[in-house]
Amino acid sequence: MYHLGVPTSRSLSVVSTGEKVYREKVHEGAVLARVMSSHIRVGTFEYVSNFLDVAILQGFTNYVIKRHYPELAKNANPPLALLKTVMNKQIDLVINWLRIGFIHGVMNTDNMSITGETFDYGPCAFMNNYHPDTVFSSIDVQGRYAFGQQPGIVQWNLVCLAEALIPLIDKDADKAVKMAQEVINSFPAIYKEKWWQMNGIKLGFTSVAENEKQLIEDLLTWMQNNQADYTNTYLAIANYYQQTDEKYITPDFAQWYQRWEDILKANNISLSSALKTMQQHNPEFIPRNHLVEKSLDNACLQQNFTLFNELLKTSKAPYQAQSSYKHLQTPPPDGDKGYKTFCGT
């Protein structure tokens, strides 16, 4: 995730415990230590607000601002400014997840950092075939944390943060609620604007107007209807004239591609410039779920680290084309249908 350009915690160490862990099958137990700029979550604010007094909540909030957002201390209303700042951090984070096809899998308030970093890599996975309802987590039977539901869950979690901060935003509870609500109500417009920008950049555009928006929507619809791989579709666009995959050698895709070229020309964007932008924002490689599983089985059961090392190498340079590792771009034949992740994943 770090090399994909996504704010994230980082792995520090793995220590074997010698114990057995029972998930979908029996695993060898281990403890993974991760580091990040803060382990304070929305859930931390909920705990302090619900179980401790207002003075402690005020001191805790002051500490968070001093440590992570000192510029907010001079704001007329630091707690409200903190809510706005965390909201923007979280919008940027989920936009990055959507850009690369990442599904977190368990987005409760204890798994939402106030610094906008990805952490708690439990039942997470990367999407192959594009569909907004894609779910991999074995415990997410209702699809609450599906790929396309993630922005809504972020907003829900921000509501929880706002509720925790109400006593500090204003002594008048009704006034505080109204002020917090105004911040939360701004979420959809801010998110949607950044979502359009992200999707535009993935296609090489510098700005997004109505023509670009329709083109983006049509591409996503085409991917969904044709069960096209999310990552590889953008690579297919960038390498259209060298394309050998039959899925992208069809009249309907050719028609869409021609519209894309026409809109680029109308915006005075050269094909080479667009492709350069696309290369910087569309990964060549993602950690394909079936390959990750296979690499772990090979390493743990057979002491064969070949695939593991290949995945490690490409994950450190995910935006660089590496012809010798083309096989790592291949999605599973069934698009990961039936694949499930667990808390130990």
Where are these regions (language model features)?
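Conserved ATP-binding subdomain of kinase catalytic cores across diverse folds
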Residues: Y2-N75, I114-E117, W156-L158, K276-T277, ...
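Conserved protein-kinase catalytic-loop position immediately C-terminal to the HRD catalytic Asp
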Residues: D110
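Regulatory N- and C-terminal appendages and interdomain linkers associated
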Residues: F136, V141-T345
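ATP-dependent phospho-/nucleotidyl transfer catalytic cores
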Residues: K20-H104, I114-T221
